[in-house]
Amino acid sequence: MFILTMGLNHHTAPIDIREKLVFKESEEEMALVTLQQEKSILENVIISTCNRTEIIAVVDQIHTGRYYLKRFMANWFQMDMEKIEPYLFFHEESDAVNHLYKVTAGLDSLVLGETQILGQVKHAFEIAKQTATTGTLLNKLFREVVTFAKKVHHHTKINENAVSVSYAAVEVAKKLYGSLDNKKIVLVGAGEMSELALQNLAGSGIADITIINRTKSNAELLANQFQAKVGAYENMNEHLMLADIVLVSTSAAEPIIKQAAMQDLMEQKASSMLVIDIGLPRNVEHDCSYIPNFHLYDIDDLAGVVSANSLERQRIVLELEKTIEAEVRNFFEWEKQLGVVPVIRALREKALDMQEVTMTSLENKLPGLTEREYIQIGKHMKSIINQMLKQPISELKEMSVEEDATTSIEHFKRIFGLSETDVTVIEKEQAETRS
């Protein structure tokens, strides 16, 4: 078993690529189940946010795991694998665990130290647990990672005055207008990002705030908290006509603010308008940026604003990275104690030995086979072995954390004809590799 992470984020892919590779919340469970059915995949969790789409998986083999993760991503989003590959990154084993710790603690975020990602990781883990795509390894890993991130935010100053994307949006507005006194702002969307923006706007001098949302009741709840007005979604353009600043953050799959409509609107509007799109996929058509006096910013445009982090926070990051390295070591020490890895390897090697004997016999009995036919038969035979072993391996992992784990594992070895010698040889090889 190996831990493998595949993904893309704001470091590796621009927004026009990221927005095409976002898992819709309504499809998360189906995506998890579909991926779990792929060969080589034993466990999986999918994290999909505005700045990253990452899959954390337990696989039976690294090289096959890489292939099936890429194939799943390409198939799910109906894109050629070759078009996706340049934007993907892979982390294996300790690097994968290290990366997840950093992501969850906010150290890999566009906004250093932000806490929103912790909730997003917890949500992703909960969905995977409910869907039964996690097991022994990922259950342990995610619990440890979430606990660590909570301690980080509680005991350090990494998130003290942490710049958020919503904060950055407000800062952009201040830079453009100098002062926000008496400016009119329209928020399209009533989710978490809009709420954060309203918190950052407190005391900024904004005179008029209107919240527009497809579900009016959600807009009303938010408006009551911040003494804002509620606008009708169907009359959005009328409200935009009067706005100085527009912040858009909805879960819409397609842009809701179109270039043609904005072209007409801006020709009638007497003043310029700042539009900040922090949705992913983007909520505003990119071509709107070419309209005179229509100042459009998306998430990637805000990167420069949020990159200025204090030296104190950078120092804390360096200390946390050392702590994370220790956490990673502890996790793999725990994994070694499971005692099932040598059993799994012994089982796999026994199966491969049987395959080799069978292939040799086949070659002798059917000398007329071409090399291509021989190779194809070998591939299919290996595929059958992998599928046959997938469920027993999953069950063995679950046995390893039960109270009577030792007895259960011994029964497992007897059922599959694994001798103590078979397992001991593997254990010695592992010890030599680690040393």
Swiss-Prot record:
Its UniProt pathway annotation is: Porphyrin-containing compound metabolism; protoporphyrin-IX biosynthesis; 5-aminolevulinate from L-glutamyl-tRNA(Glu): step 1/2
Catalytic reactions on record: (S)-4-amino-5-oxopentanoate + tRNA(Glu) + NADP(+) = L-glutamyl-tRNA(Glu) + NADPH + H(+)
Asked whether the keyword Membrane is assigned, the reply is: no
Q: Name one GO molecular function term.
A: NADP binding
* Residues engaged in binding substrate: 49-52, 109, 114-116, 120
Which residues of the sequence carry a binding annotation for NADP(+)?
A: 189-194
Q: Where is the active site?
A: 50 (nucleophile)
Q: Which InterPro entries match?
A: 4pyrrol_synth_GluRdtase, 4pyrrol_synth_GluRdtase_dimer, 4pyrrol_synth_GluRdtase_N, GluRdtase_CS, GluRdtase_dimer_dom_sf, GluRdtase_N_sf, NAD(P)-bd_dom_sf, Shikm_DH/Glu-tRNA_Rdtase
Q: Which GO terms describe its biological process?
A: protoporphyrinogen IX biosynthetic process
**Enzyme Commission number(s) of this protein:** 1.2.1.70
In chain numbering, where does the site feature Important for activity fall? 99
UniProt keyword Coiled coil, yes or no? no
Its keywords, alphabetically, are:
NADP, Oxidoreductase, Porphyrin biosynthesis
- Protein's job: Catalyzes the NADPH-dependent reduction of glutamyl-tRNA(Glu) to glutamate 1-semialdehyde (GSA).
Q: Subunit arrangement?
A: Homodimer.
Family statement: Belongs to the glutamyl-tRNA reductase family.
Q: What else is known?
A: During catalysis, the active site Cys acts as a nucleophile attacking the alpha-carbonyl group of tRNA-bound glutamate with the formation of a thioester intermediate between enzyme and glutamate, and the concomitant release of tRNA(Glu). The thioester intermediate is finally reduced by direct hydride transfer from NADPH, to form the product GSA.
Cite the domain annotation text: Possesses an unusual extended V-shaped dimeric structure with each monomer consisting of three distinct domains arranged along a curved 'spinal' alpha-helix. The N-terminal catalytic domain specifically recognizes the glutamate moiety of the substrate. The second domain is the NADPH-binding domain, and the third C-terminal domain is responsible for dimerization.
Full protein name: Glutamyl-tRNA reductase
